[in-house]
């Protein structure tokens, strides 16, 4: 599912809200989550999972085409850890 599909579904399931309103709400939620991660925080959605930022150190990589050594800079990457409830639902054997 992509962002536009999520917005369309939420708008269809909540007829009292316009698609524009849903779009705005989803946009604000995502911006707040990104802002928290930018500030070095963690975003936790109980039952779903937690987003955080991890640091990757600088390293020497290889160009797969030429085999030449390439310096890769240190960087920050988003990290997602799924929650227990999400893992349980994904691994349920159809008994729910």
Curated annotation (Swiss-Prot):
<dbReference type="InterPro" id="IPR010992">
    <property type="entry name" value="IHF-like_DNA-bd_dom_sf"/>
</dbReference>
<keyword id="KW-0804">Transcription</keyword>
<protein>
    <recommendedName>
        <fullName>Integration host factor subunit beta</fullName>
    </recommendedName>
</protein>
<dbReference type="GO" id="GO:0006417">
    <property type="term" value="P:regulation of translation"/>
</dbReference>
<dbReference type="GO" id="GO:0005829">
    <property type="term" value="C:cytosol"/>
</dbReference>
<dbReference type="GO" id="GO:0006310">
    <property type="term" value="P:DNA recombination"/>
</dbReference>
<keyword id="KW-0805">Transcription regulation</keyword>
<comment type="subunit">
    <text>Heterodimer of an alpha and a beta chain.</text>
</comment>
<dbReference type="GO" id="GO:0030527">
    <property type="term" value="F:structural constituent of chromatin"/>
</dbReference>
<comment type="function">
    <text>This protein is one of the two subunits of integration host factor, a specific DNA-binding protein that functions in genetic recombination as well as in transcriptional and translational control.</text>
</comment>
<dbReference type="Pfam" id="PF00216">
    <property type="entry name" value="Bac_DNA_binding"/>
</dbReference>
<dbReference type="InterPro" id="IPR005685">
    <property type="entry name" value="IHF_beta"/>
</dbReference>
<dbReference type="GO" id="GO:0003677">
    <property type="term" value="F:DNA binding"/>
</dbReference>
<dbReference type="GO" id="GO:0005694">
    <property type="term" value="C:chromosome"/>
</dbReference>
<keyword id="KW-0233">DNA recombination</keyword>
<dbReference type="InterPro" id="IPR000119">
    <property type="entry name" value="Hist_DNA-bd"/>
</dbReference>
<keyword id="KW-0810">Translation regulation</keyword>
<keyword id="KW-0238">DNA-binding</keyword>
<dbReference type="GO" id="GO:0006355">
    <property type="term" value="P:regulation of DNA-templated transcription"/>
</dbReference>
<dbReference type="InterPro" id="IPR020816">
    <property type="entry name" value="Histone-like_DNA-bd_CS"/>
</dbReference>
<comment type="similarity">
    <text>Belongs to the bacterial histone-like protein family.</text>
</comment>
């Amino acid at each position: 599912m992509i962002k536009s599909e999520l917005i369309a579904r939420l708008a269809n399931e909540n007829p009292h809200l316009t698609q524009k309103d849903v779009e705005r709400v989803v946009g604000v939620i995502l911006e707040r989550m990104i802002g928290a991660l930018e500030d070095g925080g963690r975003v936790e959605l109980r039952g779903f999972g937690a987003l955080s930022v991890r640091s990757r150190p600088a390293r020497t990589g290889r160009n797969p085409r030429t085999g030449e050594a390439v310096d890769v800079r240190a960087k920050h990457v988003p990290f997602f850890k799924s929650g227990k409830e999400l893992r349980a639902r994904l691994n349920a054997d159809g008994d729910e």
